[in-house]
């Protein structure tokens, strides 16, 4: 759900973007179908990927919270991984709704369900990204300042930080609660982002609506991808440099971990 659909007056003959990506005015649509021919041709593959992700995500991420709570000692790391697995588990649970949307080719659950579902997806996805950043910073501090970390890293502080991450993610997804709406197009109901509000003049539209659209796009890109990537990359570089100075033979492991995290962030931002 990365990217922003356009529900604007400037293109009255445009199909509003659904849960995925906005469509351009020039895209030719088949009036007898609710999705474009390009999207329709990818439906089987998309459904297979989402179904597999649902099964693996629910089983894998559902096991991690149980293990961290009942089978492991409570530490800063287990607190962070518990919340990370919980966010990913919740995101996995939402995938059947997306599969249902793809099967029906339109949004049939109403406007408030449109707002709540997209807000929920961005809440869990943003929480997962922010927790990856928190884990990376925690690892970096532990390696660079071990004495300070030993005296100040506590489970209680980790829990408060994790709670703060959830609040930050909730703030990031608030735009979907405000601007998400539904609209019929060619007889098919779509769930999309509508940036022009009621009682706005044409002059206000150009400035205000475009500003809202760009603000949401930049917030998602900077806070959902580029920002976490920069922080995680910096932490991995600092850890690797410290380990190399100390002659650790496995100093390249943080680099490989960074590649895995980058792949996860990139794949997640495009899948959603």
UniProtKB/Swiss-Prot annotation:
GO terms for biological process: complement receptor mediated signaling pathway; inflammatory response; phospholipase C-activating G protein-coupled receptor signaling pathway; positive regulation of cytosolic calcium ion concentration. SUPFAM superfamilies: Family A G protein-coupled receptor-like. It comes from Homo sapiens. It is a multi-pass membrane protein. The chain crosses the membrane at residues 47-67, 79-99, 117-137, 159-179, 214-234. It comes from the Eukaryota. It is found in: Cell membrane. GO terms for molecular function: complement receptor activity; N-formyl peptide receptor activity. Residues 1-24 are annotated as: Disordered. Belongs to the G-protein coupled receptor 1 family. Orphan receptor. Residues 68-78, 138-158, 235-272 are cytoplasmic. One of its GO terms (cellular component) is plasma membrane. Glycans are attached at residues 30, 199. Disulfide bonds join 114-191. Gene3D superfamilies: Rhodopsin 7-helix transmembrane proteins. Keywords: Cell membrane, Disulfide bond, G-protein coupled receptor, Glycoprotein, Membrane, Receptor, Transducer, Transmembrane, Transmembrane helix. Residues 1-46, 100-116, 180-213 are extracellular. This is Putative G-protein coupled receptor GPR32P1. InterPro entries: Formyl_rcpt-rel, GPCR_Rhodpsn, GPCR_Rhodpsn_7TM.
């Amino acid at each position: 759900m990365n990217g922003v659909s356009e529900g604007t007056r400037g293109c009255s003959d445009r199909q509003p973007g659904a849960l995925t990506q906005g469509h351009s005015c020039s895209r030719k649509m088949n009036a007898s179908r609710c999705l474009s021919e390009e999207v329709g041709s990818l439906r089987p593959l998309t459904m297979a990927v989402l179904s597999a992700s649902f099964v693996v995500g629910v089983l894998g991420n559902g096991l991690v919270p149980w293990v961290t709570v009942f089978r492991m000692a409570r530490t800063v790391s287990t607190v962070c991984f518990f919340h990370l697995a919980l966010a990913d588990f919740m995101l996995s649970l939402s995938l059947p709704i997306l599969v249902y949307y793809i099967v029906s080719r339109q949004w049939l659950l109403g406007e408030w369900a449109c707002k709540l579902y997209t807000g929920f997806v961005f809440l869990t996805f943003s929480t997962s990204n922010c927790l990856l950043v928190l884990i990376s910073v925690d690892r970096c501090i532990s390696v660079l300042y071990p004495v300070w970390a030993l005296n100040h890293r506590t489970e209680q502080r980790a829990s408060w930080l994790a709670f703060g991450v959830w609040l930050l993610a909730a703030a990031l997804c608030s735009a979907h609660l405000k601007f998400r709406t539904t609209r019929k197009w060619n007889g098919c109901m779509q769930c999309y982002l509508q940036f022009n509000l009621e009682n706005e003049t044409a002059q206000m539209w150009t400035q205000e609506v475009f500003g809202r659209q760009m603000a949401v796009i930049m917030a998602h890109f900077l806070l959902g991808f580029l920002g976490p990537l920069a922080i995680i990359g910096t932490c991995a570089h600092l850890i690797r440099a410290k380990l190399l100075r100390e002659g650790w033979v496995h100093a390249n492991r943080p680099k490989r971990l960074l590649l895995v995290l980058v792949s996860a962030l990139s794949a997640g931002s495009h899948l959603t």
